Amino acid sequence: MPTILVSALEASSNVHLEELRRNLPKDYRFIGVFEGKEALYSPREFSIMGFRDVIGRLGFLLKAHKEMVQLAKQADMVLLMDSSSFNIPLAKKIKKQDPHKKIMYYILPQVWAWKKWRAKSLEKYCDFLGAILPFEVGYYQKKAQYVGHPLLDEIKYYKKDIKGETLVFMPGSRKSEIAKIFPLFVKVAQILEQNEGFKRRVLVVPSFFKGLDLKALYGEDIKLFEISYDAHKSLFEAEFAFICSGTATLEAALIGTPFVLAYRAKTMDFLIARMFVNLHYIGLANIFYNALNNETPGLGESQLHPELIQHFLSVEGLLKAYEEMDRERYFKESLRLREYLASGSARKIANGMAFLLNLT
């Protein structure tokens, strides 16, 4: 029975991990950080945003890091997913502890956007790099393989036309995101009802919020919305979506649902990030759409969907995006993006894990 040390700190990584486990033999045992009863820590304990937040949780992060390195001694191999600030140093320490321990990195850091030197670190400490974007492989010498984007394995609903019955609102999965974005979405929903009459308003809530007091998280205005824990189905049924930056924006693009990206960070965090990351776009769909059109990812001229970031984010801007978006063009181009990203990611990663285990 192979034992796999997993480090999956993000909510989206755990969705991908769930699909991966469906493609693995039932006797694989998982330990580490992931959504599951047998985990050392839940990903929710790592749900922090911003530089100040990291400093405040530094003691916990160092403790978790040390425990994961020790836990690696029990594992036959290591699977790291996303979260490069935690996982690259983890890979380094595990390799130092046991140079023969096989390490796979799935959902690679965005070295094409910033910190390109991380590519060398990954190749030094990891044995298999699963790239989910076609253009990522070019940033590595030999260990990266394109495996397809995992969302195309996970999404079961794809629009055949742009029709929809509801308005979907997705203000993020972190409390800080919800606090900044949800009040704007509430005002948008109220104004649209005044202008266009009643439409079903669906608030998509992360599945890991089940059982929590949603009114405490979202406030009294949550009563204006229907609650859904199924993002894919809700997006499929929607006429339009208002979405906080993140994986959900790419999900909407692949499903074919028109949307506008909304994002606002703490001012200091935003300014610091701008010092390191120089991109025109932050939305994954726009970044990948640039690559599809043979432009530098995140720096191209082409745009699939509107983005309203920081001080550009307003109720008026969101309403304008809803009213003026060319839905026919968007739908046509979203189909091109879907074809570009391919599928079969989970199966290929499962095969890669089996290969590494055979080498141990």
Swiss-Prot record:
Catalytic activity: a lipid X + a UDP-2-N,3-O-bis[(3R)-3-hydroxyacyl]-alpha-D-glucosamine = a lipid A disaccharide + UDP + H(+)
EC category name: transferase
A single GO cellular-component term on record: membrane
EC id: 2.4.1.182
Annotated pathway: Bacterial outer membrane biogenesis; LPS lipid A biosynthesis
Keywords noted in UniProt: Glycosyltransferase, Lipid A biosynthesis, Lipid biosynthesis, Lipid metabolism, Transferase
GO molecular function: lipid-A-disaccharide synthase activity; phospholipid binding
A Pfam family reported for this protein in Swiss-Prot or TrEMBL: LpxB
GO biological process, one term: lipid A biosynthetic process
Family annotation (PANTHER family): LIPID-A-DISACCHARIDE SYNTHASE, LIPID-A-DISACCHARIDE SYNTHASE, MITOCHONDRIAL-RELATED
Family: Belongs to the LpxB family.
Function noted in UniProt: Condensation of UDP-2,3-diacylglucosamine and 2,3-diacylglucosamine-1-phosphate to form lipid A disaccharide, a precursor of lipid A, a phosphorylated glycolipid that anchors the lipopolysaccharide to the outer membrane of the cell.
Protein's recorded name: Lipid-A-disaccharide synthase
Record lineage: Bacteria, Pseudomonadati, Campylobacterota, Epsilonproteobacteria, Campylobacterales
